[in-house]
A protein has these predicted regions:
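Thiamine diphosphate
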Residues: 1-153
Length: 153
C-alpha cells in the first residue's frame, strides 16, 4: 500500500501475475523501470513467462515475492508446498534469489536495484513491513480499474 500511496509511483494492477510479468517486460523494453510485487503462490503463475520469455531473451526487472507461510486448515493447499520449497522453485526457473534486507532500507534498495540487472528474485520474509492503509482515493481508483478489466475496457 505504501507504494500505491506514493505520488511518484504509477501503480498498474494486473489480472494475474503472468500478465504483470508481461506488462513489466514491455515497460522494461520501452526504457521504463518496472517492479513486480507478488505473493509466493503467484510465482507459479509466472513460470511460463519466466522460462519462455524473460530468461531466454535476457529480460530483467525486479521481482519481489512474499514468502507466504502455510497454516493447517489453509484453504489453498499449494501454500503448504510453497512454504518449504519456494527457493527450489525459483532455482528451477533458472533464477537466483536472496532475502530482502528488512533491517537496512539502503541495503534493500541496493538489492532491488541489483535484481534489475540479473535474473534474481527478492524474497520478502513475513512481517518485514509495517502495516500501511491504502488511501481512500486509491481504493476507489483500484475498484474502478478492476471493474474496467472485468468488463474488457
Amino acid at each position: 500500500n505504501e507504494a500505491i500511496n506514493h505520488e511518484m509511483i504509477e501503480y498498474c494492477p494486473a489480472a494475474s501475475e503472468a500478465v504483470a510479468c508481461s506488462i513489466a517486460a514491455g515497460l522494461k523494453m520501452a526504457g521504463k523501470k518496472p517492479i513486480v510485487i507478488i505473493q509466493s503462490s503467484g510465482l507459479t503463475n509466472m513460470g511460463s513467462c519466466i522460462t519462455s520469455f524473460l530468461k531466454p531473451y535476457g529480460v530483467t526487472f525486479p521481482i519481489l515475492t512474499s514468502w507466504r507461510t502455510y497454516k493447517e486448515g489453509d484453504s489453498e493447499i499449494q501454500h503448504k508446498h510453497l512454504a518449504s520449497e519456494l527457493p527450489k522453485l525459483i532455482n528451477a526457473y533458472g533464477y537466483k534469489y536472496h532475502f530482502l534486507d528488512s533491517q537496512n532500507i539502503d541495503n534493500a534498495i541496493n538489492q532491488i536495484n541489483n535484481s534489475d540487472k540479473t535474473h534474481t528474485i527478492c524474497i520478502i520474509k513475513k512481517d518485514s513491513f509495517d502495516k500501511v492503509n491504502l488511501k481512500t482515493k486509491h481504493q476507489l481508483l483500484l475498484l474502478l480499474k478492476a471493474t474496467m478489466l472485468l468488463l474488457g475496457c
